[in-house]
């Protein structure tokens, strides 16, 4: 099949891992000769990279698919692809539900997109959901940004949280070698990228599957070791990482983050619940006391560190008192940002089968109460920025105000200020903050520090 002058479109649902996978699959499609189309109705290949963490995201996928399936009856050459976690979970059942589909592929197969599409173009309907070793030879991604980039360091998850479908759809943990991670970062540095976010479902579990151990029995390749190994990559000014699991978040890692100047003082560590009984029912493997100690240790080493997290309300059996324990933890810690969600039963998870499910009304009420507190605490946390000078990495123009540029502080606060994006994109700018909101800042530039060129 000739792919020149043909177009593709990717719609991505869900987490940062999916966004990184979509960038790699876009790179594969462009290597094959396809051009990107913003409008799916003008595309010859439409790929939905899906999320199954919550039911609403899954239902949205089926809605999109229904529209394009109708179009395929009028345009038989249209190629429809479902990738990601819904594809992995449903497999061949997706073909029965949407027979117009050409390719169903789980997240472990993202790097095999070219081979799978060539099979489709040869006339086959393809399902690729079997467990595979993720290919280390990662195709050059089509990055959405020219300033910041994702770099996967570990795929999959070995945890068995009772509410979560991720281990079922993303497979067991597979760490990339330190050499492969550094090589990708070096290439990004040569291309002019300034900030790297290292990605993993449980990134602080990195290296447990790699060979070797220290004489003390510690894994030879921990995430802390990886940070030291990649920290001096030329051209890279900032390093972030996500997502961390409290079970593996050590003082050694915290100390490394405090010592390494490129590592940003921002930590995303989901706690899910502030009640020990619920944490045990969730099989999270820690207590709320341990979580508090982690945050206390971070703030001891880095008093101004930004903390973000995830929380679930309405987990099966959650009492009002248990929910209030979550509110207390949020009130005590004071998160800079908190991603909240009402519990959504997911197929194949233990908690979905439990009889003590809460009503949608109760879940909605608790979510609203939690979100109110989150906004109050975030606004309180923002006050510390007023009048301060913050280093901002400029990423893009403010879409709502063409006279402003936008970027993020080291603590991950979205920040706006007057400026020309053509002059400032990719630059580190000292900004004096004169306006604060719960989740963003506004200021005036006072100094531009030219980022190091390589």
UniProtKB/Swiss-Prot annotation:
Its EC number is 2.8.4.3. GO terms for molecular function: 4 iron, 4 sulfur cluster binding; metal ion binding; methylthiotransferase activity. Disulfide bonds: none annotated. Its main location: cytoplasm. Residues 6-122 form the MTTase N-terminal domain. Pfam families: Radical_SAM (PF04055), TRAM (PF01938), UPF0004 (PF00919). The keyword Iron applies. Its cofactor is [4Fe-4S] cluster. Residues 383-447 form the TRAM domain. [4Fe-4S] cluster 1 binds at residues 15, 51, 85. GO terms for cellular component: cytoplasm. It catalyses: N(6)-dimethylallyladenosine(37) in tRNA + (sulfur carrier)-SH + AH2 + 2 S-adenosyl-L-methionine = 2-methylsulfanyl-N(6)-dimethylallyladenosine(37) in tRNA + (sulfur carrier)-H + 5'-deoxyadenosine + L-methionine + A + S-adenosyl-L-homocysteine + 2 H(+). Residues 143-380 form the Radical SAM core domain. Coiled coil: none annotated. Binds 2 [4Fe-4S] clusters. One cluster is coordinated with 3 cysteines and an exchangeable S-adenosyl-L-methionine. GO terms for biological process: tRNA methylthiolation. Keywords: 4Fe-4S, Cytoplasm, Iron, Iron-sulfur, Metal-binding, S-adenosyl-L-methionine, Transferase, tRNA processing. The keyword Secreted does not apply. It comes from the Bacteria. [4Fe-4S] cluster 2 binds at residues 157, 161, 164. Catalyzes the methylthiolation of N6-(dimethylallyl)adenosine (i(6)A), leading to the formation of 2-methylthio-N6-(dimethylallyl)adenosine (ms(2)i(6)A) at position 37 in tRNAs that read codons beginning with uridine. PANTHER family: CDK5 REGULATORY SUBUNIT-ASSOCIATED PROTEIN 1, MITOCHONDRIAL TRNA METHYLTHIOTRANSFERASE CDK5RAP1. Monomer. Belongs to the methylthiotransferase family. MiaB subfamily. This is tRNA-2-methylthio-N(6)-dimethylallyladenosine synthase. It comes from Trichormus variabilis (strain ATCC 29413 / PCC 7937).
């Amino acid at each position: 099949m000739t792919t020149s002058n043909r177009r593709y479109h990717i719609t991505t649902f869900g987490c940062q891992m999916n966004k990184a996978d979509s960038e790699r699959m876009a790179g594969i499609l462009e290597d094959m000769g396809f051009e990107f189309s913003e409008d799916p109705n003008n595309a010859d290949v439409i790929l939905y990279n899906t999320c199954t963490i919550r039911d609403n995201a899954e239902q949205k996928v089926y809605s999109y698919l229904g529209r394009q399936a109708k179009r395929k009856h009028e345009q038989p050459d249209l190629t429809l692809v479902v990738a990601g976690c819904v594809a992995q979970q449903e497999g061949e059942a997706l073909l029965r539900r949407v027979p117009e589909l050409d390719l169903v592929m789980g997240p472990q197969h993202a790097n095999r997109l070219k081979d799978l599409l060539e099979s489709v173009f040869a006339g086959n309907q393809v399902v690729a959901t079997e467990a595979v070793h993720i290919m280390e030879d990662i195709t050059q991604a089509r990055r959405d940004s020219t300033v910041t980039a994702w770099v996967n360091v570990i795929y999959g998850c070995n945890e068995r949280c009772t509410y979560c479908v991720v281990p079922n759809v993303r497979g067991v943990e597979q760490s990339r070698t330190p050499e492969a991670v550094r090589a990708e970062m070096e290439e990004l540095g040569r291309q002019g990228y300034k900030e790297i976010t290292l990605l993993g479902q449980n990134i602080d579990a990195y290296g447990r599957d790699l060979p070797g151990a220290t004489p003390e029995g510690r894994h030879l390749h921990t995430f802390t070791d990886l940070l030291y190994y990649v920290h001096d990559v030329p051209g890279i000014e900032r390093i972030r990482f996500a997502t961390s699991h409290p079970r593996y978040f050590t003082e050694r890692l915290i100390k490394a983050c405090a010592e390494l100047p490129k590592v940003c003082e921002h930590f995303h560590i989901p706690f899910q619940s502030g009640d020990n009984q619920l944490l045990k029912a969730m099989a999270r493997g820690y207590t709320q006391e341990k979580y508090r100690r982690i945050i206390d240790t971070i703030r001891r080493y880095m008093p101004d560190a930004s903390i973000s997290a995830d929380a679930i309300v309405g987990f099966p059996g959650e009492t009002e008192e248990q929910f209030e324990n979550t509110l207390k933890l949020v009130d005590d810690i004071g998160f800079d940002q908190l991603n909240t969600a009402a519990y959504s039963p997911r197929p194949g998870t233990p908690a979905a089968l439990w009889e003590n499910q809460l009503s949608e009304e109760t879940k909605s009420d608790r979510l609203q109460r939690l979100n109110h507190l989150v906004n109050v605490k975030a606004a309180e946390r923002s006050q510390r920025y007023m009048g301060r000078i913050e280093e901002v990495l400029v990423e893009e123009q403010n879409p709502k105000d063409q006279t402003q540029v936008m970027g993020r502080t080291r603590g991950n606060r979205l920040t706006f200020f007057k400026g020309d994006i053509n002059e400032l994109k990719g630059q580190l700018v000292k900004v004096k903050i004169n306006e604060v909101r719960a989740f963003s800042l506004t200021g005036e530039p006072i100094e531009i520090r030219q980022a190091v060129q390589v």
